[in-house]
Amino acid sequence: MTVSQLLKQRVRYAPYLSKVRRAEELLPLFKHGQYIGWSGFTGVGAPKVIPTALADHVEKNGLQGQLAFNLFVGASAGPEENRWADLDMILRRAPHQVGKPIARAINDGRIKFFDKHLSMFPQDLTYGYYTRERTDGKILDYAIVEATAIKEDGSIVLGPSVGGSPEFMSAADKLIVEVNTATPSFEGLHDIDMPVLPPHRVPYPYTRVDERSGLDAVPVDPARVVALVESTERDKVGPNTPSDEGSRAIAGHLVEFFENEVRHGRLPANLLPLQSGIGNIANAVIEGLAGASFRNLTVWTEVLQDSFLDLFENGSLEFATATSIRLTEAGFEKFFANWDEYSSKLCLRSQVVSNSPEMIRRLGVIAMNTPVEVDIYAHANSTNVSGSRMLNGLGGSADFLRNAKLSIMHAPSARPSKTDPTGISTIVPMASHVDQTEHDLDVLVTDQGLADLRGLCPRERAREIIRQCAHPDYKPILTDYLDRAEHYAQRSRSMHEPHILQQALRFHTHLAEKGTMKVPSWD
C-alpha cells in the first residue's frame, strides 16, 4: 500500500515501512478471548485506528459478545474503550477506567473489572499474575501502541503518555504500532525504565525530579512488530471542570496550611514535589498555588493538566515529572507552540516509576487526592459508592497517600442527592468501603476547613474532622453519633475507636431509602 510522506518522516527504521497496513487488513488477527494491552493513560496516547476498526467490524456484523477481549490499559483510555463496552467487546478490564458506558457495563456485571495500585499493575502483569489460566505460556497476545515516531534502531517513541506501555510491549507476543502523524512527535520528552524481574532489580537512580536515565524510546525486537498503521486522529480531551466557590475555598485552606508549614520549618520555602489528581478541586489547588508566593516548585505526579501550564508561565514551576500530559485541545496548542520552553522542564516516565513508592518516599512528595467519602476516623473510600457501585478505580491514590511525606485528601463537605442539595455527606460515621486506611492520611480538607490529623488518636481525629470538615447540616448528627459511640464503648471497654455497628452505616441506608443522609435520629 502507499505510504504517506508524513509516515515516512516519522518512521526512521526502514524495515518497518514494509509492514504498513490498513487497519481492516489486520482484523483476522483478532480472536475472541484474546488478551490485549493498549497504550494510553487518562485518555491520551491510546490507540485509535485498530480499536475503531474492530468496533466497526463488530457493529456491522452483529458480533456483540462474540468478539470480545481481556483488555489491559495503564489507566483509562479514550472514547474507543467506551464504544467497546457498549458493544460488549470487553470480557475483563483492569486497572482503571473513566466513562459512563464502561462503568455501566461493570456495574451491570457485563465486564469483569478489577482495580489495582497503578504502580503495581504493569509489573504484576509481567509476572503472569493476570493470565494464570493460560496454557500457552503467553501473557498478552497483542500490545497495540500509539507512537509519534520510530527511531533508527526500531525503538518506539511514545506520545503524550507512557503509562504501562513498556511492560505491555515487553510482555506481548506481537506488537501493532499506530504511528500518529496528526500530532507532533514527542521525541525527547520521555525517560523509559524497562521492566526487570526480581531478584535482579536495583534502586531507581533518581534523587531529583529532573534526573533521567537517558532512554527516550521503548526498545523492541523488530521481529515482534507485525504491523504499522498510520493514525491521523488527535486525542480528544474535553474541557476541564472549572473551579467553583467550594473548590477555591479548599485551595485557600491548603495554601494557608503550606505557608504555615514553611513558617514552622516543616517544609522548605519551595515546598516539596507536588502530586495532584484530576478534577475541579485539583485545578483549583494548582490555580491557588499559581497565585501564591511559592516559587521554584517541582512536581512528581501522574497527570499534568492545563492548569500546570499556568505555573510554568508565571515562573512558579521549575520542573515536572508525570506519566501523562492530559491537555485540552487549547492546552495542546499552547504546549506545541511553546515546545522548547515546556519540553525542557518536563519528563514523561512509566507509571511504575511515576507512582513508585520508592520514589515518592525518597523525594518526600506532597500528595493530594479526592475521595468519595471519609469516615470520622480517617478511613477513605476512593472507589465504591455506597460500598458497591464502582466509579473509576483506585488509580494511584494509594501509591501516593501511603508513601508521601504529606498525605492530603480534599473533597466538598457535601454533595447533592436527587432530592436534597446537601443530601450526601463526604464525612460519614463509617466508610462503606475502605481504600486508604486511617494510617495513611495526614490532612483532610473540605470547603469548611482543614483538619490536621498528624499524631492524633482516633477519638481526637474524629472530633477534629467533624469540627473542621463536616458540613453544618451534618455536624450535629455526626457529633451525636460519636457521643453515643463513646458512651457505648465505655461500657464495653473499647474506647480506642468507638463504633456502634448497628448504626455505623445508617447514613448509607438512609440515603438509599430516603434520598438523604440526614438521619433524623439514632434511636
Swiss-Prot record:
One of its GO terms (molecular function) is acetate CoA-transferase activity. CoA binds at residues 277-281, 392, 396. Its main location: cytoplasm. It is an enzyme of class 3 (hydrolase). Keywords: Cytoplasm, Hydrolase. It comes from the Eukaryota. GO terms for cellular component: cytosol; mitochondrion. It is found in: Cytoplasm. InterPro entries: AcetylCoA_hyd_C (IPR026888), AcetylCoA_hyd_C_sf (IPR038460), ActCoA_hydro (IPR046433), ActCoA_hydro_N (IPR003702), NagB/RpiA_transferase-like (IPR037171). Pfam families: AcetylCoA_hyd_C, AcetylCoA_hydro. It catalyses: acetyl-CoA + H2O = acetate + CoA + H(+). The active site is at residue 302. The keyword Transmembrane helix does not apply. GO terms for biological process: acetate metabolic process. Its EC number is 3.1.2.1. Belongs to the acetyl-CoA hydrolase/transferase family. Presumably involved in regulating the intracellular acetyl-CoA pool for fatty acid and cholesterol synthesis and fatty acid oxidation. This is Acetyl-CoA hydrolase. It comes from Eremothecium gossypii (strain ATCC 10895 / CBS 109.51 / FGSC 9923 / NRRL Y-1056) (Yeast).
